Amino acid sequence: QRQMCIRDSLKTMPRFWTDNGFYIEMLWLLSIGIMLDYEDDLIHGLVQLIKDREAKDYIYDTLIRYRFPDWERTTNQVLYPSPYRIAITVTELAEQDKAEAVKRLEKYLKKEWYRGHSDLSWHDDHKYGINHDGYWCFESGALVKVLGLDDSSLKGLPYYPYDMVHWNDNIK
């Protein structure tokens, strides 16, 4: 059922994706796909949309390379530096010191992620009685998985999707 949602999104996104629209939706879909180990054909469908739109983004590249190691990095920039440039910092830190990368990600989750989305329509939905499914920084969970970080210190932090990252820890 969860993969049906992705398939449905793949059908509708091409009609609505604009140069500045659907960046976050694609980031979320890629991130959730990485965390929940979606089938390659689903991830490939997302990748094809990115290719078709020539969307060059560091986070997209990092996540895609995790599933498809032959993917060539298209850029060392993020399409939306605020708040997403942190992904570059965390990735670079992880190459040298994974514990420092987790600390930086923790700071991002605590102080920067929600505030960095203040210009989006869903920001502060909880204050207006609007039904919503919470605020989730899906890309943080995907980065933890991709970079092989120990996220035990992130468990319970607002916005961090710990259970998604660890959904299959006990399934063998």
Name what the model sees in each region.
Residues 8-10, 17-172:
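Terminal, non-catalytic domain-edge segments
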